[in-house]
């Protein structure tokens, strides 16, 4: 089954060492020595993010210390903006994962959890069996190889919307935070500056239009998935019209969200 989200521990997973013991300045994260293994792993994760995989944090840590590293360490490849959601606290990690799934509105079975601790991996496997928990080798130099060997993130074609997905979840978090400043939803929606652009018989996004026909939710009245070639055939046909909508607001671009044949 294809997975949507990688949930990441921090200490000895995204960097070497433990912040609570080594301090934010004492962790291993550099382009030389042991720290280079974590740089390589972060780069592979960033590549996943840029292909549309959601990244989230699940760490038992003091949030102030952890965020100091993420925000200020010059060797961090992954920035705060790359994480769609965070749970940096002292709660059990299985509970954190359930909260992350709820916040992101995705299924537990679409998540993969990376943690260097065998104890944490065992706990999550038992308490949240829907989540995939790969064995992470003791040697950090093998982290990247382990990630790239997983079969869960393969895709037939990567669309612009796929590439944007990680950012879409980040901007959605910003919207939710902004909504708290409004007394009613109507005023909040007005503040978004929503703009919908409708395109007719445009062949520049056939991969995405075909992708939308594969959706299995209640908003798909077609129920017959189309290939990109079939979509293009409809666009070029004299007997059909193809319309699609792209939505933006002040926080960002939702991408192509609807198609009608």
What is the predicted role of each segment?
Residues 1-169, 173-261:
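Catalytic cores of nucleotide-enabled group-transfer and carboxylate-activating enzymes in metabolic
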